[in-house]
């Protein structure tokens, strides 16, 4: 699937495949976490991003999203309020969270924002419960494809436990 986007000067069209857009989005959301220079958040977020595809394959997209909200102690309504305040691209979620920089909530927001842009504008945990199987399957495949990109960038850009000392011996 190709998408035509205008370049920054809005004069020529740039063709980007869905895979390119996934990679671009993944880069920006991982960079947002890296730019905080919060080692603890980076470690926790990187670990969670690596585990998320397996969680989705084992438990399903709905249960994984519900798990992320439960661990963040956040309601779907609160998460939707945060998502509704994001009106820029690339999205800047961390500034919308204030002091509540939880890796679970952040990953939920990153996944759901992407799904809203590429599957259905109204997607969240509640709406996925009432969707037909084909839409849930589509959303699941999109989430896993996105997380594969995010995992690659997380490994490259985020601090991980033990990673800093690997090259010093």
UniProtKB/Swiss-Prot annotation:
It is found in: Cytoplasm. The keyword Cytoplasm applies. GO terms for biological process: defense response to virus. Its main location: cytoplasm. Keywords: Antiviral defense, Cytoplasm. CDD domains: Cmr5_III-B. InterPro entries: AF1862-like_dom_sf, CRISPR-assoc_prot_Cmr5. Gene3D superfamilies: AF1862-like domain. It comes from the Archaea. The keyword Cytoplasm applies. One of its GO terms (cellular component) is cytoplasm. Monomer in isolation. Part of the type III-B Cmr ribonucleoprotein (RNP) complex, an elongated RNP with Cmr2 and Cmr3 as the base, with Cmr4 and Cmr5 forming a helical core along the mature crRNA (39 or 45 nt in length), while the complex is capped by Cmr6 and Cmr1. The 5' end of the crRNA is bound to Cmr2 and Cmr3, while Cmr6 and a Cmr1 subunit (Cmr1-1 or Cmr1-2) cap the 3' end of the crRNA. CRISPR (clustered regularly interspaced short palindromic repeat), is an adaptive immune system that provides protection against mobile genetic elements (viruses, transposable elements and conjugative plasmids). CRISPR clusters contain sequences complementary to antecedent mobile elements and target invading nucleic acids. CRISPR clusters are transcribed and processed into CRISPR RNA (crRNA), formerly called psiRNA (prokaryotic silencing) in this organism. Belongs to the CRISPR system Cmr5 family. NCBIfam families: cas_Cmr5 (TIGR01881). This is CRISPR system Cmr subunit Cmr5. It comes from Pyrococcus furiosus (strain ATCC 43587 / DSM 3638 / JCM 8422 / Vc1). The gene is cmr5.
């Amino acid at each position: 699937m190709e998408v035509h986007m205008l370049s920054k000067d809005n004069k020529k069209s740039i063709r980007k495949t869905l895979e390119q857009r996934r990679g671009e989005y993944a880069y920006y959301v991982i960079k947002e976490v890296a730019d905080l220079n919060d080692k603890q958040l980076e470690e926790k977020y990187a670990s969670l991003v690596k585990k998320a595809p397996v969680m989705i394959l084992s438990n399903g997209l709905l249960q994984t999203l519900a798990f992320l909200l439960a661990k963040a102690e956040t309601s779907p309504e609160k998460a939707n309020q945060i998502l509704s305040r994001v009106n820029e691209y690339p999205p800047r979620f961390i500034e919308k969270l204030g002091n509540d920089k939880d890796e679970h909530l952040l990953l939920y927001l990153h996944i759901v924002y992407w799904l809203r842009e590429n599957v259905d504008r109204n997607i969240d945990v509640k709406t996925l419960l009432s969707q037909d199987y084909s839409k849930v399957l589509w959303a699941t495949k999109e989430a896993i494809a996105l997380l594969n990109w995010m995992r690659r960038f997380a490994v490259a850009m985020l601090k991980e436990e033990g990673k800093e000392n690997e090259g010093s011996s």
